[in-house]
Amino acid sequence: MNKRNKVKQLNRSADHRKAMIQNMVISLLRHERIESSVAKLKVARSYAERIITRAKRNLDANLANLDEQKKNAAILHNTRYLYSHLGDQEIVTKLLKDLANRYAERVGGYTRIIRLVNRPSDNTAMGILELVDRKTQDELKAEAKAKREEKKPAKKEEKPKKAKKEKAAASN
C-alpha cells in the first residue's frame, strides 16, 4: 500500500539530502538567486522560509516585551540555531543584519520559484529560486559604478615634461 511521505526523498540518502539542501539555502542567501530542478527548489524554499522567519525573531519589535536578560538569551539562542543549521558565519551575519530587516514587514513568502524550460538532456523541469524584493541587476550595476567613482582618486595636474628635461640638461 502506498503511504504518504512527509519528506521528499529526492532520490538521495538522508545525510546527502540534508547537506544538499543546506548548501542550496546558503547559496540562495549569499547570491539571492539559484537555479536548479523544481523538485529541489521546492524543498529548499520551505527550508529557506523557516530560516528567514527564525532570523526575524531577533528584531527588536519581536523581543520588546522581554526583560534585558531574556532578550539577550533569545538573541543568542536564535543566532546559535541559525549557525548550527547554516554553518557559515558570513551568511548568518547577512541574514540577521540585512535580510531580517528587509522582510520585517512581510509575513512569509520571502522567496519565489520562476519556472524555466525543461533541461534538454533528461527533460527535468528547471527553475530559479530567488528572494523577493531583491535588487535587480541594473540596480547592482549602478551601485557598483557609483562605488568605483567614489574610489577613483582625483586626477593630478600634469606638469609639462619639458621642464624635467631642461633641469636635467642644465645640471650637466
From Swiss-Prot:
Query: One GO molecular function term?
Result: structural constituent of ribosome
Q: Which Gene3D superfamilies match?
A: Ribosomal protein L17
Q: Keyword Ribonucleoprotein on this protein?
A: yes
Name it. Large ribosomal subunit protein bL17
Keyword DNA-binding recorded: no
Give the encoding gene's name. Answer: rplQ
Could you name the Gene Ontology cellular component terms for this entry?
cytosolic large ribosomal subunit
Checking PANTHER family in the record gives: LARGE RIBOSOMAL SUBUNIT PROTEIN BL17M (PTHR14413:SF16), RIBOSOMAL PROTEIN L17 (PTHR14413)
Q: Which family does it belong to?
A: Belongs to the bacterial ribosomal protein bL17 family.
Output the NCBIfam families linked to this UniProt entry.
L17 (TIGR00059)
User: Self-association or partners: how does it assemble?
Assistant: Part of the 50S ribosomal subunit. Contacts protein L32.
